[in-house]
C-alpha cells in the first residue's frame, strides 16, 4: 500500500543492487549512498531520488534503512545488519598467518609507494586497491589528512620491540594485546569482525624471533612477512558530546632504513608507516582542507570521502555517502596530499553481511506508468554527473571516446572537439577535422530562456511556468514546482530543450523540389534551441533522448526554425486530421500530425513561438536578405546598395497582413534588381562560362566549335569499336546498359578529355549505344529535313540505275559536316557487315537499326509504317553502293 512521506526523509543504502528499468535506464545503488524518500509505493519498492536534482527512481525497500533527522550525528553511521548493543560484548579474535614475501623489501623496510597517497603497500596490494570499487563496493579506499604531531626519534625498528603500544582511543571497544615484531615485521592494529560491531578480528603477523606454533610447522621454511593493505576506516556513531570532543593528536616516530639510509616515519597509535614526512601538512593543520564539497564539520565529514574507480571513464572519483556528493580527482589535486591508512586485510573466512532477498517484482504493481518527471525537461537542467565533471557549455554534449579522451559534440553542426592539456596543465580544445586549436569551445547561439514546458508522460501535454525576471527555473521537485537559482548559475546550467514527443511526419518537398509520394512514419521529435529534429528510431528510450539528443539516435531530418513558416495544412495536402505544414527557409516542406488535437495544438504553439523569437532576434531586412541569397553565389549589387537596403526604415511586425505585404514587396524589389543585372546567355557563352553540350548540339555548330569536319566523339567511338573487334555478336543490335550510357553521356558533355579505354566503358555495347544516342538526339538528323522527301521520292523509283543515281546525287548535295560524317559512319558500317558471319549483322539488320535514326521527317506523318520502310531502304541502298557513293580520295 502506498504511503506518502511527510517532511524530508532520507534513506541510506546498506546493500548494493542493480537493475534495468522498463524504460531501458540502468539503475545501480551502492552502500553508504543517501537518497531522499519521495513515496513508499509498496512494501517492496520505494520511490527516491538523489539530492540535489536527480531523477526519481525506485529501489528495494529491504536494501535501505531510514535515517533520522540530519541534525543527529548518528545518522552518519554506516549500515549494519544489527543495532549496536548497549554494552560491549567480549571480543572474539581470529588469528591467521599471512605470507606475503613480495610485500617487504630485502631488509624488511617498506617498499616505496609510487601513487598519489604516501602509504606503503606491495604490488599485489596496490593492484587490489585499484580495483576495490568493482570488487568490493562497500569497502572504498579513504584518504585521510594527518595533522602535525611531535616526533619521538629512534634509530631503527629494533627500538620499537621494547616500546609499549596502546590501542588508539575510540577505535576498539576494549583493550587488546599487540605483538612486537622485528625489523621484518610491523605493528598491526586489530580489526573488528563483520559479525557485529563489538566483535573484532586480530590478524597477527608472524614474528621471526618467536617459534611458530605446531599447527603451522609447514611454514617454517618459508617465514611469513608482513602484509600491508589499504582499508577504509569505517566511521562509528558517537554521541553528540563525544563528537564535539577534540581528537588526540597522534605521535610520529622518525626511523632510518638500514638498507637505503632513507628516513621513514612510524605512528605507534595507528600502526601507519610512511616514507613521506607528516610535517608537510603542519601549515594546513590549523585549517585543514575539506573534501571536494565544502562542509561545516571538518571532523565528522572530512574523512567520509571515499575513493572509487569509474570503469567507463577509467578515472578516479570521490564520493561522500553522507552528503551524496561526487567529485573527480581533478578537483582535489590542489588539496594537501593525503595518506592511506595501513591496516591488515579482513580474514577471508570471516562471514560477510548477508543481503536481504530480492524483491518480488521489478516495479510496484499499483503503478502502471512511469513517474511524471521521467519525461519532463528536468534532465536538461541537472547538475553535471560523473560522466561530465566539467561544465559543458549550452549546445554541447560531452562524452569519453574509446581512446579515453574527452569529446565535445555540437548539437547543431555535429562538430567534435577534443579536450587536451598543455604542459602546464591548462586545458585547451583541438578540432581533428581542420587541426584548429582554441582555448574555449565555440559559442553556440542559444535564444533567450523562455517559459519551460513541463511535459507529461508522453511529452505532449506541457504546463507552462512563467519564471521571474531575475531568476531562471532550474530544477523540478517531486511535485512539479520550480526551484529558483541565481542568474549566474542558470547561465551555466540552463539549456534550451523546449519540447519532445512522438509525432507522425512526412517530407513533401526537398529544397523546393516536390516529392512524389508521402511516407508517413512515427518518430521521436525534439524541439531544442530553435531546431526541430526528427529521429529515425522512435523505440529508443525517450528519457535518454531528453538528456543527450545527439547520442539518442541518428537524426533523419533537422529543420532550422529561423526563417521558417508554420500553418495548418489544408485538406488537399493531407486527408488526415490535425496536420501542421512546416516550410523551412531552404524550401523544404514537412507535414506533422498527431491524433490528439490537444497535443498537436501544444506543438503548434511551441514551434510558432520558436519561429517568432528567432525572427525577432534578427532585423527584418537581414532575414529577407538571407532568404533571397540562399543557394545563390552571386551578389545582388554592390556593397553600397546592400548597406542602403539593410537600413531599417520601419520596424515591421514579423506576423500579420501588413508585414506580409511589406515582405513581398521587398522580395519583388530584390528579384527585379537581380534580373536586371543578370547577364545574357550569349554573353556567358562568349566569356566561356557556358558551353554547349555535345549531345543535342547541332552538327554544324559542333564541328565548327571543335574545328573538325567530323565530331570528335563519333571518331572516338568508331575507333574504339573497331579496336575491340568487329566480330562481336549483335554489334549495334544489342543495347548496352542504359545507366552506363547516361554516365558516358554526362562525361562527354562535361569533360573534354574522354578516354573510352577506361574500365568503366569496357562493354562495347555501351559505346555503340552512346553513338546511336548521339545521332538520335541531333536537333536535325544526319539526313536533313530539307532532303527527306527527295530521298523518299528517289527510293520509290522503279528503275534501279536511276534510283541509285538520284540517291548518290542527293548524298553529295548534303552540307559538308553531314556528308563527311555520313562517309565515316557508312564506311565503318560496311566493315561491320563484312564480319556478318561472326557478328550476325547483315545489310538489312544494320539498315533496320540506323534507318529511323538517320532519316526522319520533321513532322510525323500518318503513314508511319510505310515511311519507316522507305527509311530502311534508303540506308540499305547507300550501304550496298557505299564505294560508288563515297569514292576513296
UniProtKB/Swiss-Prot annotation:
<keyword id="KW-0728">SH3 domain</keyword>
<dbReference type="GO" id="GO:0005096">
    <property type="term" value="F:GTPase activator activity"/>
</dbReference>
<dbReference type="InterPro" id="IPR001202">
    <property type="entry name" value="WW_dom"/>
</dbReference>
<feature type="compositionally biased region" description="Acidic residues">
    <location>
        <begin position="329"/>
        <end position="341"/>
    </location>
</feature>
<dbReference type="GO" id="GO:0017124">
    <property type="term" value="F:SH3 domain binding"/>
</dbReference>
<feature type="domain" description="WW 3">
    <location>
        <begin position="411"/>
        <end position="444"/>
    </location>
</feature>
<dbReference type="InterPro" id="IPR036028">
    <property type="entry name" value="SH3-like_dom_sf"/>
</dbReference>
<dbReference type="GO" id="GO:0007264">
    <property type="term" value="P:small GTPase-mediated signal transduction"/>
</dbReference>
<keyword id="KW-0963">Cytoplasm</keyword>
<dbReference type="InterPro" id="IPR011047">
    <property type="entry name" value="Quinoprotein_ADH-like_sf"/>
</dbReference>
<feature type="modified residue" description="Phosphoserine">
    <location>
        <position position="466"/>
    </location>
</feature>
<dbReference type="InterPro" id="IPR001849">
    <property type="entry name" value="PH_domain"/>
</dbReference>
<dbReference type="GO" id="GO:0051015">
    <property type="term" value="F:actin filament binding"/>
</dbReference>
<feature type="modified residue" description="Phosphoserine">
    <location>
        <position position="347"/>
    </location>
</feature>
<dbReference type="InterPro" id="IPR050729">
    <property type="entry name" value="Rho-GAP"/>
</dbReference>
<keyword id="KW-0597">Phosphoprotein</keyword>
<dbReference type="GO" id="GO:0006898">
    <property type="term" value="P:receptor-mediated endocytosis"/>
</dbReference>
<dbReference type="InterPro" id="IPR000198">
    <property type="entry name" value="RhoGAP_dom"/>
</dbReference>
<feature type="region of interest" description="Disordered">
    <location>
        <begin position="447"/>
        <end position="474"/>
    </location>
</feature>
<feature type="compositionally biased region" description="Low complexity">
    <location>
        <begin position="383"/>
        <end position="395"/>
    </location>
</feature>
<feature type="region of interest" description="Disordered">
    <location>
        <begin position="104"/>
        <end position="132"/>
    </location>
</feature>
<comment type="function">
    <text>Rho GTPase-activating protein which may be involved in clathrin-mediated endocytosis. GTPase activators for the Rho-type GTPases act by converting them to an inactive GDP-bound state. Has activity toward CDC42 and RAC1.</text>
</comment>
<feature type="site" description="Arginine finger; crucial for GTP hydrolysis by stabilizing the transition state">
    <location>
        <position position="733"/>
    </location>
</feature>
<keyword id="KW-0677">Repeat</keyword>
<comment type="subunit">
    <text>Interacts with SH3KBP1/CIN85.</text>
</comment>
<feature type="domain" description="Rho-GAP">
    <location>
        <begin position="697"/>
        <end position="886"/>
    </location>
</feature>
<dbReference type="Pfam" id="PF00169">
    <property type="entry name" value="PH"/>
</dbReference>
<feature type="region of interest" description="Disordered">
    <location>
        <begin position="329"/>
        <end position="397"/>
    </location>
</feature>
<feature type="modified residue" description="Phosphoserine">
    <location>
        <position position="456"/>
    </location>
</feature>
<feature type="domain" description="PH">
    <location>
        <begin position="496"/>
        <end position="612"/>
    </location>
</feature>
<dbReference type="InterPro" id="IPR001452">
    <property type="entry name" value="SH3_domain"/>
</dbReference>
<dbReference type="InterPro" id="IPR008936">
    <property type="entry name" value="Rho_GTPase_activation_prot"/>
</dbReference>
<feature type="region of interest" description="Disordered">
    <location>
        <begin position="617"/>
        <end position="655"/>
    </location>
</feature>
<dbReference type="Pfam" id="PF00397">
    <property type="entry name" value="WW"/>
</dbReference>
<dbReference type="GO" id="GO:0051056">
    <property type="term" value="P:regulation of small GTPase mediated signal transduction"/>
</dbReference>
<keyword id="KW-0472">Membrane</keyword>
<dbReference type="InterPro" id="IPR036020">
    <property type="entry name" value="WW_dom_sf"/>
</dbReference>
<dbReference type="GO" id="GO:0005737">
    <property type="term" value="C:cytoplasm"/>
</dbReference>
<feature type="domain" description="WW 2">
    <location>
        <begin position="299"/>
        <end position="333"/>
    </location>
</feature>
<dbReference type="GO" id="GO:0007266">
    <property type="term" value="P:Rho protein signal transduction"/>
</dbReference>
<keyword id="KW-0343">GTPase activation</keyword>
<dbReference type="GO" id="GO:0005886">
    <property type="term" value="C:plasma membrane"/>
</dbReference>
Amino acid at each position: 500500500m502506498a504511503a506518502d512521506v511527510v517532511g524530508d526523509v532520507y534513506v541510506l543504502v546498506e546493500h548494493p543492487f542493480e537493475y534495468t528499468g522498463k524504460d531501458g535506464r540502468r539503475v545501480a545503488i551502492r552502500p553508504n549512498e543517501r537518497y531522499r524518500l519521495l513515496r513508499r509505493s509498496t512494501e517492496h519498492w520505494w520511490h527516491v531520488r538523489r539530492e540535489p536534482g536527480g531523477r526519481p527512481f525506485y529501489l528495494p525497500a529491504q536494501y535501505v534503512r531510514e535515517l533520522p533527522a540530519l541534525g543527529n550525528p548518528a545518522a552518519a553511521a554506516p549500515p549494519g545488519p544489527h543495532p549496536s548493543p548497549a554494552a560491549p560484548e567480549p571480543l572474539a579474535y581470529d588469528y591467521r598467518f599471512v605470507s606475503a614475501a613480495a610485500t617487504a623489501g630485502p631488509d624488511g623496510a617498506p617498499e616505496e609507494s609510487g601513487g598519489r597517497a604516501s602509504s606503503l603497500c606491495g604490488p599485489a596490494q596496490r593492484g587490489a586497491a585499484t580495483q576495490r570499487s568493482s570488487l568490493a563496493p562497500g569497502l572504498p579506499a579513504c584518504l585521510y589528512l594527518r595533522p602535525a604531531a611531535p616526533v619521538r626519534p629512534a634509530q631503527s625498528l629494533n627500538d620499537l620491540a621494547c616500546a609499549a603500544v596502546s590501542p588508539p582511543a575510540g577505535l576498539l571497544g576494549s583493550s587488546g594485546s599487540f605483538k612486537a615484531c622485528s625489523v621484518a615485521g610491523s605493528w598491526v592494529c586489530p580489526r573488528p569482525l563483520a559479525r557485529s560491531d563489538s566483535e573484532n578480528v586480530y590478524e597477527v603477523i608472524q614474528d621471526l624471533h618467536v617459534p611458530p606454533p605446531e599447527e603451522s610447522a609447514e611454514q617454517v621454511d618459508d617465514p611469513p612477512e608482513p602484509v600491508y593493505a589499504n582499508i577504509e576506516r569505517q566511521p562509528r556513531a558517537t554521541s553528540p558530546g563525544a563528537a564535539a570532543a577534540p581528537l588526540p593528536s597522534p605521535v610520529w616516530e622518525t626511523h632510518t632504513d638500514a638498507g637505503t639510509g632513507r628516513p621513514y616515519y612510524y605512528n605507534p597509535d595507528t600502526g601507519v608507516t610512511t616514507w613521506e614526512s607528516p610535517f608537510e601538512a603542519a601549515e594546513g593543520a590549523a585549517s585543514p582542507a575539506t573534501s571536494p564539497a565544502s562542509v561545516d564539520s571538518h571532523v565528522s565529514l572530512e574523512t567520509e570521502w571515499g575513493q572509487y574507480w569509474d570503469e567507463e571513464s577509467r578515472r578516479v572519483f570521490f564520493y561522500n555517502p553522507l552528503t551524496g556528493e561526487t567529485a573527480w580527482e581533478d578537483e582535489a589535486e590542489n588539496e594537501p596530499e593525503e595518506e592511506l591508512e595501513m591496516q591488515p586485510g579482513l580474514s577471508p573466512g570471516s562471514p560477510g553481511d548477508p543481503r536481504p532477498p530480492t524483491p518480488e517484482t521489478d516495479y510496484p504493481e499499483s503503478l502502471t506508468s512511469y513517474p511524471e518527471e521521467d519525461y519532463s525537461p528536468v534532465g536538461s537542467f541537472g547538475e553535471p554527473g560523473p560522466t561530465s565533471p566539467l561544465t559543458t557549455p549550452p549546445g554541447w554534449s560531452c562524452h569519453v571516446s574509446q581512446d579515453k579522451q574527452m569529446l565535445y559534440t555540437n548539437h547543431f553542426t555535429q562538430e567534435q572537439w577534443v579536450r587536451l592539456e598543455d604542459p602546464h596543465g591548462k586545458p585547451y580544445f583541438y578540432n581533428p577535422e581542420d587541426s584548429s586549436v582554441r582555448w574555449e569551445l565555440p559559442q553556440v547561439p542559444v535564444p533567450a530562456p523562455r517559459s519551460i514546458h513541463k511535459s507529461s508522460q508522453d511529452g505532449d501535454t506541457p504546463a507552462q511556468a512563467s519564471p521571474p525576471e531575475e531568476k531562471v527555473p532550474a530544477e523540478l521537485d517531486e511535485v512539479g514546482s520550480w526551484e529558483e537559482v541565481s542568474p549566474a548559475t542558470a547561465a551555466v546550467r540552463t539549456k534550451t530543450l523546449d519540447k519532445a514527443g512522438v509525432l507522425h511526419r512526412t517530407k513533401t518537398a526537398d529544397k523546393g523540389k516536390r516529392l512524389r509520394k508521402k511516407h508517413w512514419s512515427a518518430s521521436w521529435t525534439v524541439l531544442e534551441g530553435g531546431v526541430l529534429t526528427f529521429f529515425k528510431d522512435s523505440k529508443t528510450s525517450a528519457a535518454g533522448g531528453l538528456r543527450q539528443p545527439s547520442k539518442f539516435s541518428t537524426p533523419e531530418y533537422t529543420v532550422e526554425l529561423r526563417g521558417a513558416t508554420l500553418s495548418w495544412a489544408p485538406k488537399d495536402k493531407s486527408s488526415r486530421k490535425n496536420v501542421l505544414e512546416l516550410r523551412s527557409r531552404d524550401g523544404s516542406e514537412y507535414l506533422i500530425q498527431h491524433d490528439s488535437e490537444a497535443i498537436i495544438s501544444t506543438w503548434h504553439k511551441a514551434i510558432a513561438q520558436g519561429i517568432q523569437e528567432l525572427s525577432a532576434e534578427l532585423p527584418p531586412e537581414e532575414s529577407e536578405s538571407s532568404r533571397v541569397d540562399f543557394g545563390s553565389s552571386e551578389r545582388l549589387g554592390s556593397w553600397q546598395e546592400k548597406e542602403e537596403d539593410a537600413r531599417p526604415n520601419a520596424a515591421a511586425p514579423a506576423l500579420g497582413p501588413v508585414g506580409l505585404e511589406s515582405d513581398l514587396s521587398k522580395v519583388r524589389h530584390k528579384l527585379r534588381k537581380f534580373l536586371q543585372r543578370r547577364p545574357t546567355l550569349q554573353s556567358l557563352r562568349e566569356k566561356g562560362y557556358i558551353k554547349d553540350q555535345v549531345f543535342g548540339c547541332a552538327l554544324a555548330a559542333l564541328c565548327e566549335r571543335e574545328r573538325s569536319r567530323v565530331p570528335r566523339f563519333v571518331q572516338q567511338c568508331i575507333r574504339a569499336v573497331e579496336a575491340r573487334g568487329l566480330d562481336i555478336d549483335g554489334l549495334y543490335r544489342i543495347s548496352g546498359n542504359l545507366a552506363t550510357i547516361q554516365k558516358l553521356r554526362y562525361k562527354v558533355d562535361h569533360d573534354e578529355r574522354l578516354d573510352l579505354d577506361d574500365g568503366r566503358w569496357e562493354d562495347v555495347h555501351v559505346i555503340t549505344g552512346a553513338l546511336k544516342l548521339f545521332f538520335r538526339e541531333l536537333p536535325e538528323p544526319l539526313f536533313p529535313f530539307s532532303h527527306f522527301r527527295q530521298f523518299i521520292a528517289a527510293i520509290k523509283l522503279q528503275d534501279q540505275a536511276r534510283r541509285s543515281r538520284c540517291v548518290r546525287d542527293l548524298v553529295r548535295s548534303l552540307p559538308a559536316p553531314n556528308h563527311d560524317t555520313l562517309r565515316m559512319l557508312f564506311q565503318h558500317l560496311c566493315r561491320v557487315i563484312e564480319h556478318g558471319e561472326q557478328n550476325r549483322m547483315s545489310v538489312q539488320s544494320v539498315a533496320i537499326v540506323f534507318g529511323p535514326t538517320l532519316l526522319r521527317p520533321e513532322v510525323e506523318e500518318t503513314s508511319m509504317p510505310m515511311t519507316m520502310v522507305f527509311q530502311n531502304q534508303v540506308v540499305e541502298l547507300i550501304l550496298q553502293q557505299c564505294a560508288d557513293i563515297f569514292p576513296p580520295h
